[in-house]
Amino acid sequence: MEIEFLGTGAGSPGKFRNVTSTALRLLDERNSVWLFDVGEATQHQILRTTLKPRKIDKIFITHLHGDHIFGLPGLLSSRSFQGGDAPLTIYGPKGIRNFVEVSLRVSETKLSYKIRYQELTTDGLVFEDGKFRVYAQHLDHRIECFGYRIEEKDHPGELQVEQLQAAKIPSGPVYGQLKAGKTVTLPDGRVINGADFLGPAQPGRIVAILGDTRQTPNAEKLAINADVLVHESTFAKGESKLARSYYHSTNIQAAELAKRMHVKQLLLNHISARYTGKMAAELQHQAREVFKQTRVVKDFDEIEVPFEKLTKEGTPS
């Protein structure tokens, strides 16, 4: 699981930062990529990465401001031109379907795949499969806006081979059955429950990706105990009143949220073009005074979301 930032700027494209788009690479977990927001020129940014549009099977839109959606029609079109034929699902506020369908109809664009739409009206679970759950919560922005919480389901515990050997259970295909937690009958008649030979379940990872927002209790629900929190930082320390008036957040507010909600790593994006070079470094320095594990990300930064294994005693290894 990796996060790749395709655009980390705010408002409009700049020399050093494109507008917002974030890729969650789940190639090992489900051989797919999920995008969060698709600002203008996102497909150009993708050309500078190893991402393949046909691998994108879900797009989560936080809100309908142009710097978060203007790249969507072009990306959908290019995915089709490049041979993508698998269905794609778009999640987002009411209106996202109309935006996409009108854009494609007016430009007479025909896609080689089906788009499914899930327009969000309430908070809660929006997707679940055998490996992941995704939750959405309303945020506090000038227009309807959502944040997303991606929860990986727990992994089965590791097979305790030493215990199996001590119990004189011979190795072979039976180990695979026991690893799956199945109950098996051995040739000598013994009935073995696989669950008795598994270590503690390994907790899945949690990533929270927020859209534009002022401080709100719903952000806490999304962020709590996250391995990684992606949070906007449109304004700097000392600009909280300005941030509130524009329905945005400061770097300090994001850091305070991360600290309060026991987040492991905070990644700040949606950086205004006002902050370049030393000023961007100062944004990071200010936030780290509150929450040390903070990073101001740049376009094309890749962040691995580590998988923390538990020992037999249930403590981090």
Curated annotation (Swiss-Prot):
Its EC number is 3.1.26.11. The keyword Nuclease applies. This is Ribonuclease Z. SUPFAM superfamilies: Metallo-hydrolase/oxidoreductase (SSF56281). One of its GO terms (molecular function) is zinc ion binding. It is an enzyme of class 3 (hydrolase). Zn(2+) 1 binds at residues 63, 65, 141, 212. The lineage of its organism: Bacteria, Bacillati, Bacillota, Bacilli, Lactobacillales. The gene is rnz. Binds 2 Zn(2+) ions. The active site is at residue 67. Belongs to the RNase Z family. Homodimer. Keywords: Endonuclease, Hydrolase, Metal-binding, Nuclease, tRNA processing, Zinc. It comes from the Bacteria. Zn(2+) 2 binds at residues 67-68, 212, 270. It catalyses: Endonucleolytic cleavage of RNA, removing extra 3' nucleotides from tRNA precursor, generating 3' termini of tRNAs. A 3'-hydroxy group is left at the tRNA terminus and a 5'-phosphoryl group is left at the trailer molecule. Zinc phosphodiesterase, which displays some tRNA 3'-processing endonuclease activity. Probably involved in tRNA maturation, by removing a 3'-trailer from precursor tRNA. Its cofactor is Zn(2+). InterPro entries: Metallo-B-lactamas, RibonucZ/Hydroxyglut_hydro, RNase_Z/BN. It comes from Levilactobacillus brevis (strain ATCC 367 / BCRC 12310 / CIP 105137 / JCM 1170 / LMG 11437 / NCIMB 947 / NCTC 947) (Lactobacillus brevis). Pfam families: Lactamase_B. NCBIfam families: PRK00055.1-3, RNase_Z.
